[in-house]
UniProtKB/Swiss-Prot annotation:
Domain of life from the UniProt record: Bacteria
Keyword annotations of the record: ATP synthesis, Cell inner membrane, Cell membrane, CF(1), Hydrogen ion transport, Ion transport, Membrane, Transport
Family of this protein: Belongs to the ATPase delta chain family.
GO molecular function: proton-transporting ATP synthase activity, rotational mechanism
Quaternary organization: F-type ATPases have 2 components, F(1) - the catalytic core - and F(0) - the membrane proton channel. F(1) has five subunits: alpha(3), beta(3), gamma(1), delta(1), epsilon(1). F(0) has three main subunits: a(1), b(2) and c(10-14). The alpha and beta chains form an alternating ring which encloses part of the gamma chain. F(1) is attached to F(0) by a central stalk formed by the gamma and epsilon chains, while a peripheral stalk is formed by the delta and b chains.
Cellular component aspect of the GO annotation: plasma membrane; proton-transporting ATP synthase complex
Compartments in which it is found: Cell inner membrane
Role description: F(1)F(0) ATP synthase produces ATP from ADP in the presence of a proton or sodium gradient. F-type ATPases consist of two structural domains, F(1) containing the extramembraneous catalytic core and F(0) containing the membrane proton channel, linked together by a central stalk and a peripheral stalk. During catalysis, ATP synthesis in the catalytic domain of F(1) is coupled via a rotary mechanism of the central stalk subunits to proton translocation. This protein is part of the stalk that links CF(0) to CF(1). It either transmits conformational changes from CF(0) to CF(1) or is implicated in proton conduction.
Keyword Ion transport: yes
Protein name: ATP synthase subunit delta
Species annotation: Marinomonas sp. (strain MWYL1)
Topology in membrane: Peripheral membrane protein
A Pfam family of this chain: OSCP
Length: 178
């Protein structure tokens, strides 16, 4: 997966710069999200990998399937990807584009998992605390997982803060066994 992101990064960065300069970041994010979700469908994925179809046919087919969101620049981007045999990178390009978008907006997606459901006040306090610590606007997604026993696990990008009882027990067991 890391290799895919390495190859996808220049494409995502280039398309993000174009979108930013033209003020169409949201439109490009939506378009890339739809294109990425469509390209993982097994039948379409097989067709896009079929060497019997030309790059132009593949790009046009994908643009037609996603006609509601695909712009002329989007079609040109798809053609460039198809010519370079990079249509399979669309999910990674979309994910990286979203990261660039969040960074540009000084925002971050945070996944918060707790053993018990938090109240609205606790959730707001957590979001405010994380926003201050990360110096970003926080888009908080929360879920409960009773297997944590107690405490919380916070994930954002590569940062994971494991304050769960399960995590502490695992660390203790590792220390005892080593």
């Amino acid at each position: 997966m890391a290799e895919l992101k390495t190859v996808a990064r220049p494409y995502a960065k280039a398309v993000f710069e174009v979108a930013r300069e033209q003020g169409h970041i949201v439109e490009w994010a939506d378009m890339l999200n739809v294109l990425a979700s469509v390209t993982v469908e097994p039948k379409l994925k097989k067709a896009l990998g079929n060497p019997a179809f030309s790059a132009e046919e593949k790009a046009n087919a994908l643009a037609d399937v996603c006609a509601e969101v695909t712009t002329e620049q989007g079609k040109a981007f798809l053609l460039a990807l198809a010519v370079n045999k990079r249509l399979s990178l669309l999910p990674a390009i979309s994910e990286l584009f979203l990261q660039f978008k969040l960074n540009f907006e000084k925002a971050v997606n945070v996944q918060f998992t707790s053993a018990f459901e938090l109240t609205a006040e606790q959730t707001q306090a957590l979001a405010a605390s994380l926003a201050k610590k990360l110096d970003r606007t926080v888009n908080l997604t929360s879920e409960t997982d009773a297997s944590l026993i107690g405490g919380v696990v916070i994930r954002t990008g590569d940062l994971i803060i494991d304050g769960s009882v399960r995590g502490k027990l695992a660390k203790l067991a590792e220390a005892i066994n080593s």
